[in-house]
Design a protein with these regions (language model features):
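Asp-based, Mg2+/Mn2+-dependent phosphohydrolase catalytic module
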Residues: 2-40, 49-73, 80-267
Length: 267
């Protein structure tokens, strides 16, 4: 995107941008409310795999954010849609904490547990946290050896919670894929199809959009490759000088976004 152009719409990450753990980032509610009142379209694009779209929308709405489920694209929702379309009727072994299984059930995906019959032909791993026990990982490993496909909702290395930076599922997914000698299909960020899905939903060309995120690798870089403006915020994951150089714009937090937009429109 030409840096002189003001974006007409925004894709916005959730964790590290709107909230850290359960704590709402100061000014985030006001920023989204300002976008809504100004008639500027936005969608929330998140690798959250713990919540279904409906439950995440409810949590954010309870915190004061002016959002509904239709405003949100989660890695879990996108993965459920992909499995339903590409592997119709194939049993799926899902490793993911929370209620994201609701999106799989809604999409018509048949989920089986470690003692399920028939054996799963697809292994899906999300933000599994306490689900990532040795026994469950080993079961997934054996399924992969038997020919099951491996799908990652995302491959994030870490994320920020109320307790601080926390190890995510990415390293475990890499390990199990290496052990089984299989390839990983990643659905969520930074995969281009995930971004394109949100672009189609917002009904604007990618070149007229901006991505607001706290992760230079998973948020900013893929968005900029599609022609968007990358807006990196310092409110979540640690941001290096190199990260700031790669992003077209760097802000302290999303609270600064309305002022940045207003300044751009006056240029």
């Amino acid at each position: 995107m030409d840096d002189r152009i003001t974006p007409r719409g925004y894709l916005i990450d959730v964790d590290g941008v709107l909230r850290n753990g359960s704590q709402v980032i100061p000014g985030a509610v006001e920023a989204l409310s300002w976008l809504r009142s100004a008639g500027i379209p936005f969608r929330l694009l998140t690798n959250n795999t713990i919540s279904s779209r409906a439950s995440l929308a409810a949590k954010l709405s309870d915190a004061g954010f002016p959002v509904t489920a239709s405003d949100i694209f989660t890695a879990a929702f996108a993965t459920a849609s992909h499995v339903a379309q590409r592997f119709p009727g194939v049993p799926c072994y899902l490793l993911s904490t929370g209620d994201s299984a609701m999106d799989f059930h809604a999409a018509g995906v048949s989920l089986v547990g470690p003692d399920g019959s028939p054996e799963a032909g697809v292994v899906v791993i999300g933000g599994a946290e306490h689900e990532l026990t040795y026994a469950r990982l080993n079961h997934a490993y054996r399924l992969l050896l038997g020919g099951a496909k491996l799908i990652a909702m995302h491959r994030n290395v870490a994320w920020r919670t109320d307790e601080g930076m926390t190890l995510d599922s990415g390293p475990f997914i890499e390990a199990i894929a290496k052990a089984a000698g299989v390839r990983i299909l990643t659905i969520g960020k930074p995969s281009a199809p995930f971004f394109r899905q949100a672009v189609r939903a917002i009904s604007l060309p990618a070149s007229s959009l901006a991505m607001v995120g706290d992760d230079a690798r998973n948020d900013i870089a893929p968005a900029q490759r599609l022609g968007m403006t990358g807006i990196l915020v310092r409110s979540g994951k640690p941001v290096s000088a190199t990260d700031e150089e790669r992003a077209r714009v760097t802000l302290d937090s999303i609270a600064d976004l309305p002022a940045w937009i207003q300044a751009k429109t006056q240029e």
